[in-house]
Amino acid sequence: QLRHLRNGNDLQGLLKVLEMAYQPAIQDAFDFLTHSFPNKIKEPAFRHELLVHPIDSHVHKELIAMEYYERLGSYVKNHLIPAELYLDCSSPQLYWDALAPVIATMRHKHGPASYENFEYLVVRALDWDARFPSGNYPKNMRRLVLPPPISE
């Protein structure tokens, strides 16, 4: 019965995290990271804004995504949600790579603890990917047949 309660709590925690990812501000931040950030980070004025205090998160929406992953990493590190449940359906390392220059800047300004929970989450994700390089699909489960991929 205790295991059943624990599994229910794990599921509730994961559902809350997944719900957070669909909040408008978070979605906007991830859209910014995907579409605008790669060009914005090349602009000297945009990079300079990271050196001032406070940083405008309406302009630097990447900070919202970084805080999301920082919070999520803390939940995983403190066992509020099981890493396996989260890592089976997410790849935070893709965003870490894009955000590494910003994280390095924040650590230079504020110390090595800045975004350490985000880093923890990414290390766990990299370990997960090394453990399951072809995915985590059950070995004895049949696979569905897909049509040929779309071509140009």
Regions found by a protein language model. Give the residues of each.
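Membrane-proximal alpha-helical anchors
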Residues: 1-46
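Short, charged, low-complexity loops and linkers
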Residues: 45-53
